[in-house]
Structures are given as C-alpha cells and as structure tokens.
C-alpha cells in the first residue's frame, strides 16, 4: 500500500508515546488502536515483537529450525493469541478489545496459509511438562491410543520462508487497515518494532518508517520508580544502572539506514522546531498548519525526575551514566 506505516519504538519508558501522539495529531495520520493523542499508553501494538508473537514464530520456524522447535513456537504462538484476546483498552470511557474480532477471524485464515504439514504428537520436551491431569490421561490412554490420536501437541512444518513473509505482510496490512475508518491516511503504530533490531523486526510491515526514541536515564528511572513498573528495575538504582548499561550496549549501528531515525526525547521537546523538521523530512511529508500538537506540557515535565529521585539516586546515575545524560541546561527551557 502506498500510505506510510510509521512505527515508534523505545527501550522502555523513553517517550515513544510523545512522537506517536505528535503524528497522530496530524490530519494525514490515523492509528488502528487509538483515536486521539491523549498520552494514554494503552494502544501499543506488540503482536509482532512480543515473545510468542509473529517474530518469535518466524525465528523459530526459519532461524532455529527443528521439528520440535516448530511445534514449540507454534504452540506458544497459539497461547499468545489466547492471551491477547482478553486485552482491553478504554476508549471514550468504554472498554473495548485492543484486537478486534476481525483480527482473530483473519488469524485463522493466516495460520492455514503458513502451515504446510500438521499432525499431533508428544515429543519428550512436551511430555516432561505435562500437568498431573494430562500425565494421568496419557498413562491411561497410552495402552490403547497413539500419541497422534491423543492430540497433546500439534506438530507443524511451515511453508517456505518467502511465502511466510509474504503472507505475514498481507495479514498485517489487512488487520491494520480493517481497524481504521479512513484507509487513505498514513498509519502510526506505537511499539510495533524491536528497538534493538528495528529493521529485522519490521519485515512484516509494508512501506514502513521506524522511529527510535531514547531518553535521559534520570527520567527513565524516575518514571519506573513512580509508576512502580512491573517489567523494569525501578526499585533499585544500582540494578537500574547495570540494566541501562546492558541494554544501551546492545544498540546496533542503524543510524545510516534510510528507514530508521533516532530521536532524543528531550531534544525533540526543547528544539521542537528543528527536530520536527528532521522528522518530517525523514518521513517525506509536509508541515501542516492545522497541527495543534502542544509541546508545552512535555517541556514543563522534562525535569520532573528532580522531584522523584533522591540525591543519592541522582548522583549515582549522573556519575555512572554520564555519557547518556540528555537534559539540557535549565536556562535553555
């Protein structure tokens, strides 16, 4: 499709939502999962990059192939689909499913197109993980029924890699555009890429541009701490420092890619005029007069971490993560 798919990604609590909302505020952009740029983070599209998601399935099928591994990742994929079927967001004060009925209708068709061979089995790795009920069932039925008849685990072999990629692109296109009213607009997707593998993780998106966002580690830790983040080490500054050094060291050299742009959160706020011009040039889209996006609230919150961090926490981060600090001097605000 000729319209852009702009995908934002960050390593966690780094402000990807700001750039997402900035684009969503334009009249030439739309999101399948969010109607208004309200700083709400419920609308992240992680189906492709989550463990158990589409990328995990692809890597298990083709990058780490074995008959058992194909069965394992396919089983995990189906478990993941069950989990996200329960995922809800709040829109206009009403709960709605993030992934629509159309998504699950299309996923059934998609699975048929990517599997070449299928039967049931009970390989050792799966047998070792059976619960008590299934172990007892197998012990009883094994006397008069084969593992294939018992249907414990679906063993699958995929179609060729090229076909898988093509069918995945068609599927992602279809489900994204099925959830938007106006199909003649660019689409913006939050957290739809793996920050550390931006291009490899987005091979299933057509006509895409990827925006990676980094943020000052003081603000990241403060956000983790105040939110009591479930997935991040906001409880201990020393663990956070080790964590941050580790994840930053894994960033690959993607700066020269024509499809990937790196944005520094604080710089995008303070020097918004120039930074937004760079973004628009990267996306090859024009500035529009009707864009009412207000950067002032974000500008006021740049140093919010000062009120959250203790002097010790701030000193440790500023000392050990000095080269990653991004706050501008306060007089420049």
Describe the residue ranges of each PLM region.
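PAPS-dependent sulfotransferase catalytic core
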Residues: 1-163, 298-300
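PAPS-dependent sulfotransferases, especially Golgi type II membrane carbohydrate sulfotransferases
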Residues: 1-6, 25, 104, 110, ...
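A short acidic/basic microdomain associated with nuclease active sites
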Residues: 187-191
């Amino acid at each position: 499709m000729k319209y852009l798919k702009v995908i934002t990604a960050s390593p966690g609590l780094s402000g990807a939502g700001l750039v997402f909302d900035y684009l969503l505020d334009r009249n030439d952009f739309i999101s399948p999962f969010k109607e208004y740029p309200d700083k709400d983070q419920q609308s992240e599209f992680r189906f492709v990059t989550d463990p158990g998601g589409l990328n995990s399935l692809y890597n298990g099928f083709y990058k780490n192939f074995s008959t058992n591994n194909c069965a394992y990742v396919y089983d995990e994929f189906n478990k993941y689909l069950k989990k996200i079927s329960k995922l809800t967001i709040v829109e206009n004060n009403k709960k709605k499913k993030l992934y629509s009925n159309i998504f699950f209708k299309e996923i059934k068709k998609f699975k048929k197109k990517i599997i070449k061979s299928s039967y049931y089995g009970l390989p050792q790795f799966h047998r070792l993980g059976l619960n008590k009920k299934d172990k007892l069932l197998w012990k009883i039925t094994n006397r008069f029924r084969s593992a294939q008849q018992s249907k414990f685990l679906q063993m699958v072999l995929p179609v060729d890699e090229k076909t898988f990629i093509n069918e995945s692109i068609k599927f992602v296109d279809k489900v994204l555009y099925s959830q938007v009213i106006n199909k003649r607009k660019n689409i913006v997707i939050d957290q739809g890429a793996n920050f550390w593998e931006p291009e490899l993780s987005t091979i299933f998106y057509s006509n895409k541009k990827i925006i990676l966002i980094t943020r000052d580690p003081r603000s990241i830790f403060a956000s983790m701490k105040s939110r009591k983040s479930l997935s991040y080490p906001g409880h201990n500054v020393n663990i956070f420092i080790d964590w941050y050094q580790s994840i930053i060291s894994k960033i690959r050299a993607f700066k020269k890619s024509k499809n990937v742009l790196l944005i520094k959160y604080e710089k995008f706020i303070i020097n918004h005029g120039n930074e937004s011009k760079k973004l628009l040039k990267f996306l090859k889209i024009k500035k529009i007069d009707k864009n009412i996006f207000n950067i002032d609230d974000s500008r006021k919150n740049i140093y919010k971490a000062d009120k959250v961090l203790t002097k010790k926490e701030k000193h440790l981060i500023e000392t050990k993560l000095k080269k990653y600090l991004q706050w501008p001097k306060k007089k420049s605000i």
